[in-house]
A protein has these predicted regions:
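N-terminal, post-signal-peptide region of Sec/Tat-exported proteins
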Residues: 32-35, 45
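Short, low-complexity intrinsically disordered segments
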Residues: 11, 30-33
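Core beta-strand residues in small-molecule sensory/regulatory alpha/beta domains
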Residues: 7, 23-24, 41-42
């Protein structure tokens, strides 16, 4: 399975995607992509963020509610993907902020 590493605007590794599921750097399941696009919801079905530029995870402010996405089957532990390093700074697109993980998401 191909792993897509996700970073914040400062270039810090904050998550990775394996298939349609998103995990913390520790391998904890934190979300998934229910609509086959770049929008990520947390494990409770709340909007978490959107993948930009192929490797950045940003929260879009004022994102319209898309409805409850349902609940997928628990994906299990993906294993440790290895540390990808630092991605470098990337300015935030207008109307976005870095994803703020809560204790219920991580």
């Amino acid at each position: 399975m191909i792993v897509q590493n996700l970073f914040d605007s400062s270039g810090n590794w904050i998550a990775f995607r394996a298939g349609s599921h998103v995990y913390s750097p520790d391998g904890d399941w934190i979300g998934w992509l229910p609509w086959n696009d770049d929008d990520v919801v947390d494990t409770h079905g709340r909007y978490l963020g959107t993948i930009f530029y192929g490797n950045r995870l940003y929260h879009v402010l004022g994102k319209p509610y898309r409805g409850y996405p349902g609940y997928p089957v628990y994906p299990g532990y993906p294993g440790y993907p290895g540390y990808p390093g630092y991605a470098g700074y990337s300015p935030l697109p207008p109307g976005t902020r870095d994803v703020a993980f809560s204790t219920s998401t991580r």
